[in-house]
Amino acid sequence: CTGDPAKRAGNEFLFQMQAFSNIEILNQYNIKKIVTACPHCFNTLKNEYPELGGNYEVVHHTQFISYLIKEGKLTVSGGSFNGKRITYHDPCYLGRANNVYEAPRNVIEKLDAELYEMKNCKEKGLCCGAGGAQMFKESEPGNKEVNIKRTEQALETSPNIIASSCPFCNTMLSDGLKNKEKHEKVKVWDIAELINQASQ
């Protein structure tokens, strides 16, 4: 773990312990580039590790997949998603924290599917609730949990698939679908899962 959950929960000491341990190992192996499938790790490695001595080129897997497709190193056959409606949820630590919006959409564009944007997307995207460590704690009093609100926005697009690129978001949105009793009809898939399906 990069230490992100500890830091977001307010435990700076534990974060630094985890970060320094990771940096020591990564530097021992002279690591220059890291590809991560988690926007939380992406943000932490890219923006917080440098001040602790961890300087790496950090790439999110949607950026890497987009690059591989563009360079012709990964072929997407399409067809698997022909006629499917996909909506994309922007993870906070990928989008608003690091301005990565186009790479995941470029990947979805290569599928034979239709991308339907939610009313709150890109810079105005709504958090699924996991970014504030909500998935690790009990519900708080209020009108509605944020992951339910975000799931409702996704369902407004009448999707077959809700795509994202964050394991935390995928969990929160899957839970939201179960809450709305839509988990049998609508699936939550990571961008990498979509590409894996389309390249078989």
Residue ranges and their predicted role:
Residues 1-200:
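Iron-sulfur cluster-binding electron-transfer modules in prokaryotic oxidoreductases
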